[in-house]
Amino acid sequence: MEQTASPVVFAARDDASDVHFPHDDGSRVPYKVFSSRAVYDREQERIFRGPTWNFVALEAEIPNAGDFKSTFVGDTPVVVTRTEDGALSAWVNRCAHRGAQVCRKSRGNASSHTCVYHQWSFDNEGNLLGVPFRRGQKGMTGMPADFDPKQHGLRKLRVDSYRGLVFATFSDDVAPLPDYLGAQMRPWIDRIFHKPIEYLGCTRQYSKSNWKLYMENVKDPYHASMLHLFHTTFNIFRVGMKARSIPDANHGLHSIITVTKTGDDTSAAYKQQNIRSFDEGFHLEDESILDLVSEYDEDCTNHIQPIFPQLVIQQIHNTLVARQILPKGPDNFELIFHFFGYADDTPELRALRIKQANLVGPAGYISMEDTEATELVQRGTVRDADATSVIEMSRGNPEQQDTVITESLIRKFWVGYQKLMGY
């Protein structure tokens, strides 16, 4: 009989400063960081409102003047807009009057935004346009004479874009966006975003687990051919393929994983070790979902590139995705898959990208297992705040990068995380 999962509850001792990483190389991670409300709140200030650039949109989502999109930086609601002069703007979706969310639509086009509560209105850059009855009426008093609309706009974020990816930050101290992305990561972003894109749509899902468990997951090539039967059985991602597992050199928080077929038989190791994720008896009725149209100098079957803290760039065969991670508390996050193609795609290639969208997303043949795994970790660790994970794979050769049998990217991530959080 299948067990019913108990509700997740937070660890009893909840002090954000009471977090101890026993090793400084990221190989031991206290489970408290996945369930503590205090740690989560500290992350909102030190990471999402700290010296990071947060992915908020694809420029292709807001191509025209007045286009807007509601999203989040961490758990702070923000709106990203295209201004009348074609520039990008982002502001906190919180009215300067009494704090209500101003914009209640997920996306659209508007020349201004009006708060439903008291009808204060703002332009696309967050500047206050109007206050009803500001000067009173028929002798009744209004706002004080010294009320200055210029001082009561919406809180603005700094915005920049790289190759059509839009990022926002609360910080005045963060490095310029190209430097933040880093010299090692930019060429891999350029690989995918080398020409204008077309936005195809998105899927959304929630996972009852901590957002960092997903960040671990996308930095973990070791799991990819163990957990995912589809990956391994249909030769999309296997041990033995040409591989890269590269962290960024600045802080270790970004990374790139790629695999490419070489023509060698990579199934033998799975057969010999009787690994569950390889199943020769598993067949597809329509194998066209596995078609691979050559588009790049190297036709990787898998390109997974986390850009900390909210973005994962993905290419699996010909499906292209910008995954957006939105924390919703210590034990919940929203995951949005933004699907895109290139503006000059043929109708046939566009149709293939849409078909291959079934590989990922909430019911994807591959990715549905990832959030199931992160929820299992969440449920398994919630009552053992002081216990730690063991992240040892390839620790004896941490600089090796031509392998997927490694947890080096996860260790680098945790080292960078500790520095940001002050642990």
Swiss-Prot record:
Record note on quaternary structure: Part of a multicomponent enzyme system composed of a reductase (AndAa), a ferredoxin (AndAb) and a two-subunit oxygenase component (AndAc and AndAd).
Domain Rieske residues, every copy: 53-168
Similarity-based family: Belongs to the bacterial ring-hydroxylating dioxygenase alpha subunit family.
Descriptive protein name: Anthranilate 1,2-dioxygenase large subunit
Keywords of the record: 2Fe-2S, Aromatic hydrocarbons catabolism, Dioxygenase, Iron, Iron-sulfur, Metal-binding, NAD, Oxidoreductase
Binding site for Fe cation: H223, H228, D370
Note on cofactor: Binds 1 Fe cation per subunit. Binds 1 [2Fe-2S] cluster per subunit.
CDD domains: RHO_alpha_C_ahdA1c-like, Rieske_RO_Alpha_OHBDO_like
Pfam families per the UniProt record, alphabetical: Rieske, Ring_hydroxyl_A
Record's function text: Oxygenase component of anthranilate dioxygenase multicomponent enzyme system which catalyzes the incorporation of both atoms of molecular oxygen into anthranilate to form catechol. Can also act on benzoate and salicylate but not on 2-chlorobenzoate or o-toluate.
